[in-house]
């Protein structure tokens, strides 16, 4: 009875671990048998497993035996003689189940992943192991590749700079390693290809994401973008860079730090309009100027040097707020980067046009099965379940965790806090205990460094400015008397090994100088200490002037301190303070989750359209005969034409035959005249139009030959689809920027976005049909050899578009108006664009 009651009160994670333990016991029971096998017999198990899968055995049924094979192979094939611990077996099972395994630092996530990778690779569909950078992809493919190759599986790696041929070969391997960037960009590049041989990626079957929280949460708002140079607008950014410093905060503009937004006041707007010599900044013709002004305001008021970005070698480089690293090759979106370049006095690059884009959220959800591993995921489990359908299972450590996490120490001012941190570091240094101090940005790390220099304490500083020394600095961080000051760079993916005699001193002591918005980032910093059962300790020093408490904390804290009469230098330890910190972090985490969820809701609409376009493109690219495709397109176009000029809703006497003849003349159709449509009903006219178009197609094909015709159609169709899709992406961006203001009119912005984007998409697909048929019929063939150059991908600029959660959030009080359209005509009125069509069949589609 007591056991039954205990089972009721067990948490879900404990119950899950008990289920996993049964499978682990089964794997362990097979170990003696596996040890008796020769290398050849062990390797032959791969062939045997594949045959059993063909006969109908499931991967779940194979799992215990396959995992036992991998464990034995690891001991025989690696120089380290790796043997998977039971907790690593548990992690491997969780990954196979398409869940997230939370495994603490130093617990061997990389080795644990070899188990489900091998098992799932047996299907022959390929497995992708996704890391956060090229270095880890290359290292892990070589390191863990020893195990796979020993068992007869092929291993590939995708790295930046590889040729399409090299990439294709890597994807054809049983196991493919690569960074999240490379996998995402290959998907986009494949959907810009003009030759089937240039498509490299293949099917998306099963992926394991290392540091899954970094990829799916921290970078969820960071779309992958392939872009090219657009119009020249750099002079306007320089113009605003001269105007904004003359504006006064509070009088001319207001800044909302909590929501990271800025907007002009009425007085500021009048001042700017006077300097620009325009009457209304928010007129339609000044839309671009208004947008650039807004970005320039953000650059000057919200974006901070040495926190959000650094200037290095005459370039503005983004600093990742979660990792503290430089984000090479990435640029802030929507002109913000250009505004910062103007602010910092470096060369202002041209803005760009988007050719293709996708978010990590939608890219990785395309996999049949997705799993992930990280040291910090439990705090974000709700998001993983709701967005990705992935549960989080917390895997116990192989050895008990003995790190001591001390209570936070709170000060009234930032100055007092850093003074106390410096004194704490001095005490630890005198004792000989190594210390790692985490700061939130470069500026704070340099401030603390100056304080330690004044105390005569030797130390190392690790931040985005000297990231090339990272390996050397981290290598020494666990030695006696070592003091390391680091931004979040040391918070993830680093393994600090303790030097001789350090365990006796208490291990590595970690000091956090500020609470991050996310508890995960704090936990990552703590996790640098106490790895694999080592001793260690951690403590956070915070102040009421820190951004988290200042912007999201309760005002009651300051009132409490005033009543209790605390001095600035006096540390505070109070349950109310601790609770307030926790509430503030949870509040911000929930808020950021809602932002990511909203972005995904909008992106899902775009994603459906992307899937339709890319599927159409894929069919064209791989088709051997496109005549049927063109015939289907002709029928759809004829239906559009009939609805426009010969509507069934009007009497035949009112049909616009003249307009029809004029429109058809643009297509170079053969033998067409007004007599063809006299005294005929709609169906007869429809049949006649299809017949004429078909005859035109056949004559064109006879003139240039079937093979050349197929080549012509393929290149023409792909080029027209790409051009219209690019324009559509720009139009959707403009719609998205202005749609939030619909809320002021008591209309749901998301619903409005759905309807308008649907109309825009239908209009684009109709334009694609029209342009393909019109261009196909109008092309004059000078020679039998048709040579249409595709878009030159080499000229495209591959970059990451960084949507900063600090600078691209929707404005609370926006002054810029949404995209203004003229009074909307009736659906049956002539379209105001002058095409001669009805509005519903032209711009109203």
Swiss-Prot record:
Q: Which residues bind Zn(2+)?
A: 831, 833, 842-843
Show the SMART domains listed in the entry. SecA_DEAD (SM00957), SecA_PP_bind (SM00958)
Instruction: Extract the CDD domains matched here.
Output: DEXDc_SecA, SF2_C_secA
Q: Which residues bind ATP?
A: 88, 106-110, 495
Region Disordered, residue ranges? 804-838
Query: What does the Swiss-Prot or TrEMBL cofactor note state?
Result: May bind 1 zinc ion per subunit.
Q: Has keyword Cell inner membrane?
A: yes
One GO term under biological process is:
protein targeting
For this protein, the record's PROSITE patterns field holds: SECA, SECA_MOTOR_DEAD
Q: What is its EC number?
A: 7.4.2.8
Q: Name one GO cellular component term.
A: cytosol
Record keywords, A-Z: ATP-binding, Cell inner membrane, Cell membrane, Cytoplasm, Membrane, Metal-binding, Nucleotide-binding, Protein transport, Translocase, Translocation, Transport, Zinc
Membrane topology term reads: Peripheral membrane protein
Coarse class of the primary localization is: membrane
UniProt-annotated location(s): Cell inner membrane; Cytoplasm
Q: Which reaction does it catalyse?
A: ATP + H2O + cellular proteinSide 1 = ADP + phosphate + cellular proteinSide 2
- Which one of the record's GO molecular function terms can you name? metal ion binding
Name the Gene3D superfamilies for this protein.
Helical scaffold and wing domains of SecA, P-loop containing nucleotide triphosphate hydrolases, SecA, preprotein cross-linking domain
Q: Subunit structure of this entry?
A: Monomer and homodimer. Part of the essential Sec protein translocation apparatus which comprises SecA, SecYEG and auxiliary proteins SecDF. Other proteins may also be involved.
Free-text function comment from the UniProt entry:
Part of the Sec protein translocase complex. Interacts with the SecYEG preprotein conducting channel. Has a central role in coupling the hydrolysis of ATP to the transfer of proteins into and across the cell membrane, serving as an ATP-driven molecular motor driving the stepwise translocation of polypeptide chains across the membrane.
Q: Which family does it belong to?
A: Belongs to the SecA family.
Matching NCBIfam families? PRK09200.1 (NF006630), PRK12904.1 (NF009538), secA (TIGR00963)
Q: Per its record, how is this protein called by name?
A: Protein translocase subunit SecA
């Amino acid at each position: 009875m007591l056991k039954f009651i205990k089972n009721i009160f067990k948490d879900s994670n404990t119950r899950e671990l008990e289920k996993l333990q049964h499978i682990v016991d089964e794997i362990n029971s097979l170990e003696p048998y596996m040890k008796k096998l020769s290398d050849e017999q062990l390797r032959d198990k791969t062939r045997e497993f594949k045959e059993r899968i063909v006969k109908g055995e499931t991967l779940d049924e194979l799992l215990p035996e396959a995992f036992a094979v991998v464990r034995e192979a690891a001991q025989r094939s690696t120089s380290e003689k790796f043997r998977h611990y039971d907790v690593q077996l548990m992690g491997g099972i969780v990954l196979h189940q398409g869940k997230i395994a939370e495994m603490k630092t130093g617990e061997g996530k990389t080795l644990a992943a070899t188990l489900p990778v091998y098992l799932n690779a047996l299907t022959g569909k390929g497995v992708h192991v996704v890391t956060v950078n090229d270095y880890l992809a290359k290292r892990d493919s070589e390191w863990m590749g020893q195990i796979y190759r020993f068992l007869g599986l092929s291993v590939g790696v995708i790295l930046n700079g590889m040729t399409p041929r090299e990439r294709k070969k890597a994807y054809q391997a049983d196991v493919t390693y690569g960074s999240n960037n490379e996998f995402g960009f290959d998907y986009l590049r494949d959907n810009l290809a003009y030759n089937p041989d240039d498509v490299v990626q293949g099917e998306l079957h099963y992926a394991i994401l290392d540091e899954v929280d970094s990829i799916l949460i921290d970078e969820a708002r960071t779309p992958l973008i392939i872009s090219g140079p657009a119009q020249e607008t750099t002079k306007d950014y320089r113009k605003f860079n001269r105007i904004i410093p003359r504006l006064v905060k509070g009088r001319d503009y207001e800044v909302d730090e909590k929501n990271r937004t800025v907007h002009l006041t009425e007085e500021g707007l009048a001042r700017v309009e006077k300097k620009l010599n325009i009457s209304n900044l928010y007129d339609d013709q000044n839309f671009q100027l208004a947008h650039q002004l807004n970005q320039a305001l953000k650059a000057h008021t919200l974006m901070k040097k040495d926190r959000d970005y650094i200037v290095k070698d005459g370039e503005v480089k983004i600093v990742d707020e979660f990792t503290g690293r430089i984000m090479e090759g990435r640029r802030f979106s929507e002109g913000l980067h250009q505004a910062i370049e103007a602010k910092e006095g470096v060369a202002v690059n041209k803005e760009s046009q988007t050719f293709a884009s996708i978010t990590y959220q939608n890219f990785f959800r395309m996999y049949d099965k997705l799993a992930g591993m990280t040291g910090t995921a439990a705090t974000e489990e709700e998001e993983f379940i709701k967005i990705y359908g992935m549960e989080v299972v917390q895997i116990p450590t192989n050895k008990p965790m003995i790190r001591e996490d001390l209570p936070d120490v709170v000060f009234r001012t930032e100055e007092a806090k850093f003074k106390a941190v410096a004194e704490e570091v001095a005490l630890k240094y005198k004792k000989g205990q190594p210390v790692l101090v985490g700061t939130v940005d470069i500026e704070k790390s340099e401030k603390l460094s100056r304080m330690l220099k004044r105390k005569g304490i030797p130390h190392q500083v690790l931040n985005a400015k000297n990231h090339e020394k990272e390996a050397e600095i981290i290598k020494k961080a666990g030695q006696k008397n070592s003091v390391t000051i680091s931004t979040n760079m040391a918070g993830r993916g680093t393994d600090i090994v303790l030097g001789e005699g350090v365990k006796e001193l208490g291990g590595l002591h970690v000091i956090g100088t500020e609470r991050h918005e996310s508890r995960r980032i704090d936990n990552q910093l703590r996790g640098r200490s106490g790895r694999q059962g080592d001793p260690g300790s951690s403590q956070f020093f915070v102040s009421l002037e820190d951004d988290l408490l200042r912007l999201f904390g309760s005002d009651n804290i300051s009132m409490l301190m005033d009543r209790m009469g605390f001095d600035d230098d006096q540390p505070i330890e109070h349950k109310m303070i601790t609770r307030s910190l926790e509430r503030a972090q949870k509040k911000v985490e929930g808020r950021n989750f809602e932002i990511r969820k909203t972005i995904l809701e909008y992106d899902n609409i775009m994603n459906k359209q992307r899937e339709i376009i890319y599927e159409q493109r894929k069919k064209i690219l791989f088709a051997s005969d496109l005549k049927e495709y063109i015939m289907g397109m002709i029928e759809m176009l004829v239906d559009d034409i009939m609805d426009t000029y010969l509507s069934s809703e009007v009497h035949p006497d009112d049909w616009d035959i003249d307009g029809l003849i004029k429109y058809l003349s643009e297509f170079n159709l053969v033998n067409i005249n007004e007599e063809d449509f006299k005294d005929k009903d709609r169906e007869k006219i429809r049949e006649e139009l299809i017949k004429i178009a078909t005859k035109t197609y056949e004559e064109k094909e006879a003139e240039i030959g079937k093979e050349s015709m197929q080549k012509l159609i393929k290149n023409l169709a792909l080029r027209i689809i790409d051009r219209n899709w690019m324009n559509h992406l720009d139009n959707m961006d403009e719609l998205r920027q202005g749609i939030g203001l619909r809320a002021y009119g008591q209309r749901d912005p998301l619903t409005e976005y759905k309807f308008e984007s649907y109309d825009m998409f239908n209009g684009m697909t109709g334009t694609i049909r029209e342009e393909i048929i019109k261009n196909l019929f109008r092309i004059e063939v000078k020679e039998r050899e048709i040579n249409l150059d595709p878009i030159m991908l080499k000229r495209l600029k591959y970059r990451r578009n960084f949507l900063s959660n600090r600078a691209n959030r929707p404005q609370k009080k926006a002054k810029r108006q949404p995209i203004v359209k003229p009074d909307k005509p009736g659906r049956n009125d002539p379209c105001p664009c002058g095409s001669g069509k009805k509005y519903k069949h032209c711009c109203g589609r």
